[in-house]
């Protein structure tokens, strides 16, 4: 039981939950070990009778000559049941009968006494160690070391020769060989922290704090008030280090520490007195690992008689060696991508631990940042930062109810928060100087584009973009060394006035004496101008301004490139979506003057056989190489560095539509992160789509330290935002955006208060349409079934369990609003129509009325294209004898009749089972699907059924067209048949609907081009070129996803959006393909919406700026609640 007491006293600091003991500590006496009194009485008894125990009369322990009573006392303290005669003799002889020394030797692993065995091979070393200790004890008695405080300095030099003590002592000097021997064989686990001013050390005092330590020794007048205290860290034994797991070994290799977190303290005679509490010891030990921190202490109060576990009040003084190399090097380092994710996490964990302990120290010494001359007057509260600390005692209890899942799913950012983030970026961009247009650049640049060029050049050259003096980096804080420092004179400390400040990154724990410039040490940035402002032109102007490395940049390029990678010194790599490759190529050719500025597409069959040789030869290397994300991913998966995109160190890499890599775990993002480049740029109008983590992947591509480390990002951005500390997270992100991002919108004002760009007016109107009777029947049948399904799931509480089914029903309803033909491949069973007024056959019959087979109208029918030739056919109806024929219809045999007459004729023959029906004139059979109806085009391009106009056209009689197709065709005829035809862009999210529109355009003989995701890059390029340059092609049908971003379609000025999307921003992006820089005509936008359908209710959801798949600014639970409300709104529940 008494051994247990000793172990508790000696090893309690290893327990992380041990509370610190400060001056105001409320630790009561009864919180000490229960058997402490018994242990103290035993030790005190032995301390006061050491010599007597060594020579006590009584029964000896075997033949060893050791007193049995001494052995019993030793066993009672150590807790051992038995001890070998050999070991007892050795311990007793070496300790000279001093029970205190014997117990310390027994529990000190460096002596390896517990494993002593006279028959083992290792015993020789143990015997030698004990023999040497025995020889020393004969020269300097342990009794003198423990009791005679006036004659023990020389002896302590023998025990620990590294201590520089005075040699004025009456004790006989110890020879050098014994001193060296003792240096190896004494307490290796203790390393003294002597405060010795070495040649290059310059110590500066920063503060002090008080702490209540506790003793592990006992004695009378061992400490005095005001006495100097020495602090010693305990080394990790080899055995302890070997027990570490693989992960801990990696962390130790990063930390390079061979010390534990135990810190002992000794008196001025270097006699160990006790230990510091766990928290204080952990802080001091962790900071000491950095090499430039030093700690000294004095005794404030100690009992005259110290016992095991007695409280000792100390004052600890903190110093920094301002000449230490680690404090005088750049606080920024270039990020590399070679570190494995596990090692990166371990390194970040160690750095965060270092930061937490540093901030804890600052709170103890009441050290606050110096706000004078800083770029912010806002106070930085260290306690607030510690709320995200890894230290258990630093966590805020108010956040203790966060579940693991709640910390994994980051909440979305609301639009108001995005506006706050971008506001400062836009403000700083308005005051930028302008750069001159490059001489090789063929186009003129607007003023805001020249400002962007200046900003980008500054980013690549590493200079301050506003020309002002460097500012303190917003993540760093300046601290002032205390001027009036009161501490004992025996602490050697510099009082020079040259070093008045030091700098600390309160988010990472890094410390430096150098000024942390706000200009980061990376090359590149994020060009985030709003869509339509000409980001492509701005980047091309940068390429012409800085086409290659400058002379002083080449050594840096080779230093920062991956091993063995050649440098492509004059080539910029542009990575873009496949749909934009041709646009980049054409724009690059258009702006370049001279053949030496050539660009090349690296895609498909156009890829050169040897890209490395192509780009490293400066005489033939292209200025720009354009490739797709797909090609980059494909070569990344091959892991080949001998050829291809990953075989060189590029001068510049540009990611167009860079938000495509916002998922850091995607393979595309990892491919982009791995490419080697000197300058890195991201082009995106939406650097943050929904979540703050969207920005992280872009920052990792930029290799912007330290935020490209995900653990840092998560600790200081993601977790605070999730814990509702939104303002602090946004402040950090804003400080990052301020230096990385340039963003302007169409409403941004220049320095004169005028808009930076003036575009033609844009008119957006919603055209509400009404279903035909057949369409209404189809839609209502689907809506009724869908609504009953939703209601049943809401009542049963299984809505989210059947979420996919609900979304499928919504999809069918939206397709029914476009055209019933989209439902032709719908799987329908009889149970679906159990509650309806018609059967499956009737439902399919309704849909078949709208099915367009795509079969063209016969050419001999199309030849009847004039009013004169048409009137020759409709003189008199052969059925009703009306003259002329009313609502004429024409059969394949070119016999005409009234429309009503033909309908009755077909029904009559069906009743008589005459199938197929026979022509009313020549009695030839005909297919009722091959009946044609004329329409007439007026001079203004409108359609009419009257016999007026200049041109006759034909269409199928019984082929119904959806209400949206009828509305679209009516407007297209006006636009394409006018004296000056205008080009039109038609957007739809359904490619099958684009197929139907294409069939109608073909039947109308309207020239059109098509652009969607199913087409190859070459087909897309051809389609865009045809639409822009062919005067006979005035219509472009395009899918919302494939053509919603990046394209330049300013040749058109009319936009038709056939179906709404859940988010208005997606439609707005599509409109900006037309209403953008370069548009010279007013833009007219028409959005088709069918009344009394889900489309009309989708507009209300758009106005609320959130929906099922992406509710902004809500937790996962709140998103589900909001989704239920949206579904109820859609189905009018």
Curated annotation (Swiss-Prot):
Residues 1-34, 392-413 are annotated as: Disordered. It is found in: Cytoplasm; Nucleus. Keywords: ATP-binding, Cytoplasm, DNA damage, DNA repair, DNA-binding, Helicase, Hydrolase, Metal-binding, Nucleotide-binding, Nucleus, Phosphoprotein, Repeat, Zinc, Zinc-finger. GO terms for molecular function: ATP binding; ATP hydrolysis activity; ATP-dependent activity, acting on DNA; DNA binding; helicase activity; ubiquitin protein ligase activity; zinc ion binding. It holds the Pfam family SNF2-rel_dom. The modification Phosphoserine is found at residue 18. GO terms for biological process: DNA repair; nucleotide-excision repair; postreplication repair. It comes from the Eukaryota. Residues 516-705 form the Helicase ATP-binding domain. ATP binds at residues 529-536. A zinc finger (RING-type) spans 877-923. Coiled coil: none annotated. SMART domains: DEXDc, HELICc, HIRAN. Residues 971-1125 form the Helicase C-terminal domain. InterPro entries: Helicase_ATP-bd, Helicase_C-like, HIRAN, P-loop_NTPase, SNF2-like_sf, SNF2/RAD54-like_C, SNF2_N, SNF2_RAD54_helicase_TF. Its EC number is 3.6.4.-. GO terms for cellular component: cytoplasm; nucleus; site of double-strand break. Belongs to the SNF2/RAD54 helicase family. This is DNA repair protein rad8.
């Amino acid at each position: 039981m008494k051994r247990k007491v000793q172990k508790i006293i000696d090893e309690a600091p290893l327990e992380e939950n041990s509370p610190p003991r400060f001056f105001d500590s409320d630790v009561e006496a009864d919180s000490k070990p229960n058997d402490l009194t018994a242990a103290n009485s035993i030790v005190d008894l032995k301390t006061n009778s050491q010599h007597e125990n060594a020579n006590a009369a009584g029964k000896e322990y075997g033949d060893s000559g050791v007193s049995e009573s001494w052995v019993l006392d030793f066993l009672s303290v150590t807790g051992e049941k038995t001890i070998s005669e050999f070991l007892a003799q050795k311990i007793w002889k070496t300790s000279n009968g001093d029970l205190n020394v014997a117990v310390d030797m027994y529990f000190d692993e460096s002596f390896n006494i517990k494993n002593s065995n006279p028959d083992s091979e290792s015993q020789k070393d143990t015997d030698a160690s004990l023999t040497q200790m025995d020889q020393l004890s004969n020269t300097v008695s342990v009794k003198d070391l423990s009791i005679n405080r006036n004659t023990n300095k020389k002896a302590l030099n023998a025990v620990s020769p590294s201590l520089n003590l005075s040699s004025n002592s009456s004790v006989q000097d110890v020879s050098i060989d014994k001193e060296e021997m003792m240096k190896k064989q004494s307490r290796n686990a203790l390393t003294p922290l002597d405060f010795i001013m070495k040649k290059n050390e310059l110590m500066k005092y920063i503060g002090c704090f008080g702490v209540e330590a506790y003793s592990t020794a006992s004695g009378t007048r061992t400490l005095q008030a005001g006495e100097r205290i020495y602090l010693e860290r305990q080394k990790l034994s080899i055995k302890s280090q070997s027990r570490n797991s693989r992960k801990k070994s990696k962390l130790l290799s990063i930390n390079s520490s061979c010390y534990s977190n135990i810190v002992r303290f000794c008196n001025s005679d270097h006699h160990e007195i006790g230990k510091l509490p766990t928290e204080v010891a952990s802080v001091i030990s962790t900071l000491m690992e950095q090499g430039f921190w030093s700690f000294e202490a004095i005794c404030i109060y100690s009992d005259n008689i110290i016992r095991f576990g007695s409280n000792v009040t100390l004052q600890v003084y903190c110093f920094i060696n301002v000449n230490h190399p680690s404090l005088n090097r750049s606080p920024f380092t270039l990020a590399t991508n070679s570190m494995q994710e596990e090692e990166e996490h371990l390194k970040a964990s160690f750095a965060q631990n270092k930061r937490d302990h540093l901030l804890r120290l600052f709170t103890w010494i009441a050290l606050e940042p110096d706000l004078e001359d800083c770029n912010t007057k806002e106070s930085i509260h260290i306690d607030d930062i510690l709320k995200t600390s890894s230290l258990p005692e630093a966590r805020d209890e108010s956040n203790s109810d966060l579940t693991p899942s709640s910390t994994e799913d980051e909440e979305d950012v609301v639009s108001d928060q995005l506006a706050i983030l971008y506001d400062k970026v836009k403000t700083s961009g308005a005051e930028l100087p302008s750069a001159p247009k490059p001489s090789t650049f063929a186009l003129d640049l607007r003023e805001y584009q020249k400002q962007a060029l200046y900003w980008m050049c500054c980013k690549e050259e590493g200079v301050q973009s506003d020309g002002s003096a460097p500012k303190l980096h917003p993540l760093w804080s300046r601290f002032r060394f205390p001027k009036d420092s009161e501490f004992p004179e025996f602490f050697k400390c510099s009082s020079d006035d040259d070093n008045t400040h030091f700098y600390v990154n309160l988010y990472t724990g890094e410390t430096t004496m150098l000024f942390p410039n706000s200009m980061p040490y990376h090359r590149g940035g994020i060009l985030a101008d709003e869509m339509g402002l000409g980001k492509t032109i701005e980047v091309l102007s940068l390429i012409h301004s800085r086409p290659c490395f400058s002379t002083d940049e080449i050594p840096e390029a080779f230093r920062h490139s991956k091993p063995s990678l050649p440098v492509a010194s004059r080539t910029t790599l542009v990575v873009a979506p496949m749909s934009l490759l041709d646009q980049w190529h054409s724009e690059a050719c258009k702006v370049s003057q001279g053949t030496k500025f050539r660009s090349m597409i690296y895609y498909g069959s156009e890829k050169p056989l040897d890209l490395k040789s192509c780009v490293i030869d400066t005489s033939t290397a292209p200025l720009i190489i354009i490739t797709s994300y797909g090609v980059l991913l494909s070569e990344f998966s091959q892991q080949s560095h001998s050829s291809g995109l990953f075989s060189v160190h590029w001068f510049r890499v540009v990611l167009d539509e860079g938000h495509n890599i916002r998922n850091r775990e995607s393979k595309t993002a990892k491919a982009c992160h791995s490419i080697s480049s000197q300058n890195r740029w991201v082009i995106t109008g939406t650097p943050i789509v929904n979540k703050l983590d969207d920005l992280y992947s872009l920052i990792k591509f930029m290799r912007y330290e330290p935020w490209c480390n995900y653990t840092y990002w998560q600790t200081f951005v993601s977790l605070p935002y999730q814990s509702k500390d939104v303002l602090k997270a946004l402040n950090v992100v804003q400080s990052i955006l301020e230096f990385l991002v340039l963003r302007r919108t169409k409403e941004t004002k220049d320095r004169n208060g005028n808009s930076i760009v003036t575009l033609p007016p844009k008119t957006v109107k919603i055209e509400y349409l009404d279903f035909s009777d057949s369409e209404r029947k189809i839609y209502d049948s689907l809506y009724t079934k869908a609504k009953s399904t939703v209601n049943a799931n809401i009542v049963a509480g299984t809505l989210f369990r059947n979420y996919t089914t609900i979304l499928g029903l919504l999809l069918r309803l939206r397709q029914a609003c476009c055209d019933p033909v989209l439902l032709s491949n719908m799987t329908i069973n009889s149970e679906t129509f159990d509650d309806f007024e018609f059967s499956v056959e009737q439902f399919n019959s309704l849909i078949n009325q709208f099915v367009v087979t795509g079969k063209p109208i016969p050419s001999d029918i199309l030849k009847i294209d004039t009013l004169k030739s048409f009137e020759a056919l409709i003189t008199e109806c052969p059925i009703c004898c009306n003259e002329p024929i009313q609502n004429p219809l024409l059969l394949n045999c070119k016999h005409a009749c009234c429309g009503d007459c033909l309908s009755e004729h077909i029904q009559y023959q069906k009743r008589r089972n005459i199938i197929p029906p026979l022509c009313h004139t020549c009695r030839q059979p005909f297919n009722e699907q091959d009946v044609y109806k004329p329409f007439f085009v007026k001079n203004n391009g409108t359609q009419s059924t009257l016999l007026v106009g200049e041109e006759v056209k034909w269409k199928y009689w019984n082929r119904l067209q959806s209400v949206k197709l009828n509305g679209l065709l009516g407007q297209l005829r006006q636009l394409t048949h006018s004296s000056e035809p205008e080009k039109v862009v038609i957007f739809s999210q359904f490619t099958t609907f684009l197929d139907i529109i294409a069939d109608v355009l073909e039947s109308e003989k309207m020239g059109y081009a098509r652009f969607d995701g199913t087409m190859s890059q070459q087909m897309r390029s051809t389609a865009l070129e045809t639409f822009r340059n062919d005067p006979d092609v005035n219509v472009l049908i395009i899918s919302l996803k494939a053509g919603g971003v990046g394209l330049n379609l300013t040749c058109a000025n009319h936009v038709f959006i056939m179906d709404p999307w859940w988010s208005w921003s997606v439609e707005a992006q599509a409109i900006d393909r037309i209403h953008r820089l370069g548009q010279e005509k007013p833009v007219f936008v028409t959005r088709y919406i069918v009344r009394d359908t889900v489309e009309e209710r989708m507009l209300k959801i758009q106005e609320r700026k959130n929906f099922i798949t992406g509710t902004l600014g809500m937790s996962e639970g709140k998103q589900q609640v909001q989704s239920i409300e949206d579904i109820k709104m859609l189905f009018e529940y």
